[in-house]
Amino acid sequence: MKKIILIIFSLYTITASGQQFFQTTPASQKWVDKSFKKLTRKQKIAQLMVVRLSDRRGKDVVFLEPEVTRYIKKYDIGSVCLFQGSSILQAGVLNRIQAIAKTPLMVCVDGETGVGMRFADVVPLPDQLTIGAISDADLAYRIGKAIGLQCKRVGIQVNYAPVVDINNNPNNPVINYRSLGEDKYKVSLFGSNIIKGMQDEGVMACAKHFPGHGDVSVDSHLDLPIITKSMQALDSLELYPFKQMIKAGVGSMMIAHLYIPAIDTIKNQATSLSRKNVTGLLKETLGFKGLTFTDALEMKGVTKFYPAGQASVQSLIAGNDMLCLPGDLKGSIKKTRKAIRKHQLTWNDIDEKVHKVLLAKYNLGLDTLKPILIPSLSEDLNKDVNKLKKEVYENAITLLRQDNPSILPLSASKKVAYVGIGIAGPNHFARLLQENYKADCFYFDNTTDSIQARKIISDLQKYDAVIVGIHQYKKFPANNFGIAKAAVNFADKIEKMDNSISFVFGNPYAIKNFSDARNLVACYEDDSLMHAVAVNLLKGTQQAKGRLPVTVDADFHYGSGILSKVLFPIVDPKTAGLDGTILNRIDSLANNWENSGTDHRGTDPKYELRYIFFSNRVCPDSENNIISQINVRSDI
């Protein structure tokens, strides 16, 4: 009986967790009804709009506070989305506009790598493709939790993350490294863990981009991508993670701008504007009950065919709840009212969506909104980010090939050269190699001519080991990630040397250019933390544990990765939780035994020296037990 009750309780908990943002109580119903009754018809429509709060104009970041303030006062808009700027500036703006809002604003952010993706003063967390290289799903949960804590601290209620598109097209110009990889099971597991981490902190996650943006070759910011797969193919791959996100209780989903004839044959109509996709497939067939956000309606994948507010109307007809960045707010409201008069929509449709949004606002804590505390804000947002980021890097770094067993770990006694490709001078990786190996450094960038390149190749012949670092290439695959053919040819000449090892710092898809390397490591990102992890791998104090989250070429498929050798570290006894005096006694006994000049080998147990290995979790009493197990002659 107890077991049955426990199972029922567990199922209830999972279901309740999935509906945490849409639970109705007498208190929530009272707040929703009160807020709803204050809204005019124009304001009801505006409650469904997400407005941009900042923009980049040239080199400058411009806060649109005056415009947004006008929208709040005139229309009582429902939501804003944060983009560029610093945390302190953003928080100041949010405090001011929340103070004048008649209905509290739902604050959103497009923060796939945390708020550091948008705030200049906050360190971003790892890219999702880097996370896809690790094996520990609990680490994905902790990343989600860290992002949730950041969002809460700076007054954000909804984060447009994670990306759960399966990136099965290496040339994808818009998703690519933003994905968790190409395996639907891993994408689903890690995506659901990130969601749970965020939502456990009371921040609504948003799985994107439904019904799957991973297999495109056109950027939807610039045009409308077309996917010609059958419904069966979509169901078996692209839709799989989204089904799992629904089971995991994700609070919202973002709808992609794609043209998929298998879902809707209306020519040039994006899936974000398709009733068959949003209402028919997502809500009715898959049973999703959370909020739906359109992808940004200012993107050309939509505006090319539905300009000047018409995209907003069609998004609502499709069944979306929230319209992200509609651009022409006044025109969107005007055309929505016109669509209602034409019976394309009803006020009941609008009212239902507004009630849903208000209920989410209540459950996100907007009924008791407090100002964001500015002091120590930046410090709080950065707290423990580098520690968590380093842990991800340590679990992600991937050894793909090791033809020369002596190159890894690399002895500090070797004569070492470092060749930085893509940089003109020393970076953190170069400085660490100089510090740890006294490495001589050479650099190859777009200013290096063929004569200089030949001289570098010639000079490298006198070294015991040559370390190659591939740096500062672009994250997206256009124009071969910005990697020049001359750089690829130069690297190839070095990589054919048995004593060379290549570290590729960035998008792993670029490894196709360096896959002939005799010794090869995928590093995923190009920052000082990853540089330090890579040097520790060279030294043997860090093990390569990662696996490729995507297929790179015929040599390196999804899941490729070799566990590297790791040297037993020398640590201070106190660090390992041990009593140094007892260890010194063991050393003394062992040295006396070894220096006695007597052969104690044999079967007599009183001359047996047992070498006992123990972890740093050994309890203090065990140390005395170790002493008691060492039997030596009393006269030694």
PLM features: residue spans?
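Active-site-adjacent structural elements in enzyme catalytic domains
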Residues: 87-104, 137-155, 350, 355, ...
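Bacterial Sec-dependent N-terminal signal peptides
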Residues: 1-21
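Catalytic loop of the DD-peptidase/beta-lactamase superfamily, centered on the K-T-G motif
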Residues: 567-636
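Structural recognition of the beta-strand scaffold that forms the well-ordered cores
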Residues: 47-52, 78-83, 105-109, 115, ...
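Preference for extracellular/luminal or secreted protein segments
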Residues: 19-70, 284, 306-570, 574-575, ...
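Active-site mouth loops of central-metabolism enzymes
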Residues: 51-63, 128-141, 223-237, 300-306
